């Protein structure tokens, strides 16, 4: 527990560079359907996993949405003078657990644009994700979000903490 707290304390010191997110984590907020926390972990400069924990309201039902998406990024789709604007797309699976109204499991195809700032380890994104529910019955699902994430190098922070212990 002590080690985990120290890692968190040093995260701000070890922010990722805006030009290379490989191996870095982004933590932020998303507003939309669902609204909540967004975590993105880049495996390399084009592949990432996106994790969602949010609050969902659809058709008068409220509940928690938990999901994971695998994303591919295309940095050549749109160019910018400063920063980068990747188009990303992928596939994912989400679970909605409604208060007193059952659960919904659905597959989705996230499509989005992100603006990665050139001077800060921050991105701002817009995402649209159509999907198909398989539980409790087949139906169409639509997710959308606008949000932002701060990126940091967790491995660099962990090494720094271990050196101090």
Over which residues does each language-model region extend?
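Residues on the lipid-exposed face of transmembrane beta-strands in outer-membrane beta-barrel proteins
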Residues: 29, 33, 37-41, 68-74, ...
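Outer-membrane beta-barrel "beta-signal"
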Residues: 67-70, 140-165
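Residues that define the transmembrane beta-barrel architecture of outer-membrane proteins
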Residues: 23-25, 31-35, 62-66, 85, ...
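Short loop/turn motifs that connect adjacent beta-strands in outer-membrane beta-barrel proteins
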Residues: 19-23, 45-46, 75-86, 101, ...
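Sequence/structural signature of outer-membrane beta-barrel proteins
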Residues: 36, 54-60, 75-77, 93-100, ...
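Short glycine/proline- and aromatic-enriched beta-strand/turn motifs that initiate or cap beta-hairpins
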Residues: 18-58, 65
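Mid-chain, structured segments of secreted extracytoplasmic proteins
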Residues: 63-103
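Sec-dependent N-terminal signal peptides
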Residues: 4-13
């Amino acid at each position: 527990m002590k080690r985990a707290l120290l890692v968190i304390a040093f995260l701000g010191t070890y922010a990722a560079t805006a030009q290379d997110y490989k191996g870095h984590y982004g933590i932020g907020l998303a507003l939309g359907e669902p609204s909540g926390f967004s975590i993105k972990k880049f495996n390399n400069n084009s592949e990432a996993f996106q994790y969602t924990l949010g609050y969902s309201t659809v058709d008068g039902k409220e509940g928690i949405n938990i999901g994971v998406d695998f994303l591919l990024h295309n940095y050549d789709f749109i160019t910018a003078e400063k920063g980068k604007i990747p188009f990303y797309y992928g596939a994912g699976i989400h679970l909605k657990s409604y208060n007193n109204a059952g659960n919904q499991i659905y597959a989705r195809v996230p499509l989005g644009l992100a603006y990665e700032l050139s001077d800060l380890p921050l991105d701002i994104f817009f995402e649209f994700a159509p999907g198909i529910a398989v539980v409790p019955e087949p139906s169409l699902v639509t997710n959308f979000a606008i949000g932002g994430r701060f990126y940091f190098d967790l491995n660099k922070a962990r090494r720094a903490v271990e050196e101090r212990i």
